[in-house]
């Protein structure tokens, strides 16, 4: 359940409309998953809230909210691997026991690299009691700061783990094609996360279980997982013209660095951008069958705007 927080520019009823728009329009793409919507809860619906509030923390009150399918976190083995690999300075089991770190969704940042080096070295065997106490205090601060809830996984980290990101690029390209040319929304500020696939016995969804990204290698590393898309509260409708493409272009650059970027000097990043670009053009063409030629040209314009913006920022 997602409750309305009253933030400026954010509306839970608008998010519900966007969510419904994206999930109810038939789509042939199955490389990604979207949580199924279970309905909208009105703050004035006393009957519904009287049944729900007893199951929530005592400080919760009735409000506008949307109820949707829960995205299951990655397996415990994946959580442990992330901590042991990227935070060797802390006790992985302490992190694993933290209730706030149970629901680990991974954010695949295909458009950014981050070379992290731990600031903490191995403890000296000749530490004084005071040094050991300082080390324990620092460790407790680190434990409070570490969160696996929305764990950012950058390109260099995927390479370190041996993960092939090409399937994620395919899923993101398909998702953008669906949002742009099937649902006609800009995709502004949507989130992409890696989580477990929905139960195979769940036939309530019109989409099948995404399989394109679940290579044997990636599954062996993170366990069974798919790309999920969520948070549509800042999405806006677009028109099928150059103005709409411009709006989608601004949304692309305004989002977190999920998508591959053009113009990188890194060969792996170049290959990933090519995969993303080719898939987006192909999937967009499939979505726009039957549309006039002027509309069929728009996906190519979108890609060109991205390249131009990257070229300008790099010069």
Feature annotation, model-predicted:
Residues 4-48, 167, 241:
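A conserved alpha-helical element in kinase catalytic cores
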Residues 168-180:
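Short, hydrophobic/amphipathic alpha-helical packing segments
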Residues 162, 181-270:
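Catalytic activation segment of kinase domains across protein kinase-like and atypical kinase folds
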Residues 158, 162, 187, 249-312:
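Acidic, metal/cofactor-coordinating or nucleic-acid-engaging core segments within structured domains
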Residues 32-35, 183-195, 290-297:
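Short glycine-rich, low-complexity/disordered patches
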């Amino acid at each position: 359940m997602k409750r309305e927080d009253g933030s400026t520019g954010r509306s839970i009823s608008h998010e519900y409309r966007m969510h419904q728009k994206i999930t109810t329009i038939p789509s042939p793409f199955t490389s990604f998953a979207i949580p199924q919507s279970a309905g909208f809860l009105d703050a004035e619906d006393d009957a519904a809230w009287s049944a729900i509030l007893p199951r929530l923390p005592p400080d919760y009150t009735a409000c506008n909210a949307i109820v949707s399918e829960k995205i299951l976190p990655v397996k415990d083995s994946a959580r442990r691997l992330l901590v042991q690999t990227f935070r060797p300075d802390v006790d992985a089991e302490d992190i694993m026991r933290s209730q706030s770190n149970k629901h680990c969704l991974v954010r695949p940042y295909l458009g950014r690299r981050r070379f992290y080096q731990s600031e903490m070295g191995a403890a000296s065997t000749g530490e004084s009691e005071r040094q050991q106490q300082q080390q324990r205090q620092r460790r407790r601060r680190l434990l409070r700061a570490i969160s696996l809830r929305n764990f950012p996984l950058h390109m260099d980290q995927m390479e370190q783990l041996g993960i092939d990101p090409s399937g994620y690029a395919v899923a993101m390209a398909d998702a953008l094609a669906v949002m742009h040319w099937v649902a006609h929304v800009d995709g502004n500020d949507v989130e992409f996360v890696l989580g477990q696939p929905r139960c195979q016995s769940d036939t309530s969804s019109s989409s099948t279980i995404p399989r394109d990204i679940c290579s044997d290698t990636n599954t062996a590393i993170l366990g069974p997982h798919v790309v999920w898309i969520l948070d549509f509260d800042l999405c806006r409708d677009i028109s099928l013209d150059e103005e709409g493409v411009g709006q989608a272009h601004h949304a692309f650059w305004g989002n977190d660095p999920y998508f591959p970027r053009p113009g990188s000097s890194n060969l792996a990043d170049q290959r990933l951008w090519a995969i993303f670009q080719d898939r987006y053009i192909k999937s967009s063409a499939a979505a726009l069958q039957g549309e006039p030629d002027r509309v069929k040209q728009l996906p190519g314009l979108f890609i060109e705007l991205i390249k131009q913006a990257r070229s300008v920022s790099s010069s």
